[in-house]
């Protein structure tokens, strides 16, 4: 039997799936090799741009007095876009994804910014939102 708190444990995979479903095809028109992942490492050949989406310490914010039911979770995800092409590619992909998170009622902080290490451009932002047990995404 699934826990009545399963919704809280599934937020990471749900948010990842929704964002990927909404943005992957539209981004593939401009970036045909784009790869979405939740894994920091892979044995396969690198594809660029790569979009790494990871949760950052989801936090229980409200529960019943007996601590049996989670009512509210503060969820933060970090999005990291890497490319070996141009700075603007990393930034554009990150900005499109940030807007998708905004459309899903997330707060963005910091806004997407870019850094370079070697030949790789990296754009990063974080998106945060509070989820209640009966919220729909």
Where are these regions (language model features)?
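Small/polar-rich, solvent-exposed N-terminal microdomains that initiate assembly or binding
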Residues: 1-64, 87-92
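Beta-strand-rich interaction surfaces with strong enrichment in secreted/lumenal proteins
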Residues: 4, 66, 111-114
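Residues embedded in well-ordered secondary-structure elements
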Residues: 42, 66-68, 116
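Short, low-complexity, polar/charged sequence segments that are solvent-exposed and flexible
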Residues: 55-58, 70-76, 97-100
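Oligomerization/assembly interface segments of phage tail-like spikes and tubes
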Residues: 68-85, 121-133
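Short, positively charged, low-complexity/disordered linker segments
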Residues: 80-97
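Acidic-leaning, charged glycine-interspersed low-complexity segments
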Residues: 92-137
């Amino acid at each position: 039997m699934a826990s009545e708190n399963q919704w809280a444990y599934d937020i990471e995979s749900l948010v990842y799936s929704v964002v990927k479903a909404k943005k992957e095809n539209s981004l593939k028109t401009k970036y045909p090799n784009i790869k979405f992942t939740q894994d920091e490492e892979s044995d396969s050949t690198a594809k660029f741009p790569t979009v790494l989406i990871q949760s950052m310490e989801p936090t229980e914010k409200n529960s019943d007095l007996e601590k049996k039911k989670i009512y509210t979770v503060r969820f933060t995800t970090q999005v990291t876009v890497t490319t070996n092409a141009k700075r603007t590619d990393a930034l554009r992909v990150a900005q499109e994804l940030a807007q998708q998170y905004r459309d899903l009622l997330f707060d963005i902080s910091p806004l997407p910014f870019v850094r370079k290490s070697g030949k790789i451009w990296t754009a990063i932002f974080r998106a945060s939102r509070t989820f209640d047990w009966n919220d729909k995404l």
